[in-house]
Regions:
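N-terminal, charge-rich interaction modules
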Residues: 1-19
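Feature captures the catalytic cores and cofactor-binding loops of soluble hydro-lyases/lyases
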Residues: 21-24, 33-47, 51-114
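Structured beta-strand/loop patches that form or line metal/cofactor-binding pockets in enzymes
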Residues: 27-29
Length: 114
């Protein structure tokens, strides 16, 4: 499944610089707000769903090379976090929906964890 499909179907807002998502295809998903759990459980090329919006999410996402981070519940990263994400090629997306709802929608679209 293409990342652009997920963005369109869930009505996600792209927070970082727009890039061509046409070749990005997440292979799995992971949901957690505890960074140590994310580092242990999230997979390369996956989607990470969290309500965290602080600068450390960029470091973790870059370390794991996730496809994108979906920030839920209208949590908004500050401009410095977005700038850091841009410089590290980390895609940040946002939604007013809860993490539970987002994960259910992604599951409904057919994306599964490995």
């Amino acid at each position: 499944m293409k990342l652009q499909t997920i963005i369109d179907q869930l009505g996600l807002k792209v927070l970082t610089d727009s890039i061509d998502f046409s070749n990005l295809e997440p292979s799995s998903g992971y949901v957690s707000d505890l960074l140590s759990c994310v580092m242990a459980g999230a997979k390369k090329d996956g989607i990470w769903v969290t309500l965290q919006s602080h600068d450390n999410i960029v470091a973790v996402a870059a370390l794991l090379d996730v496809t994108a981070v979906i920030i839920t519940e209208d949590a908004q990263p500050d401009p410095a976090t977005i700038a850091r994400a841009n410089s590290r090629n980390v895609i940040l997306l946002s939604t007013p929906q809860s993490s539970f709802t987002v994960v259910g929608q992604i599951w409904g679209l057919g994306l599964r964890s490995e």
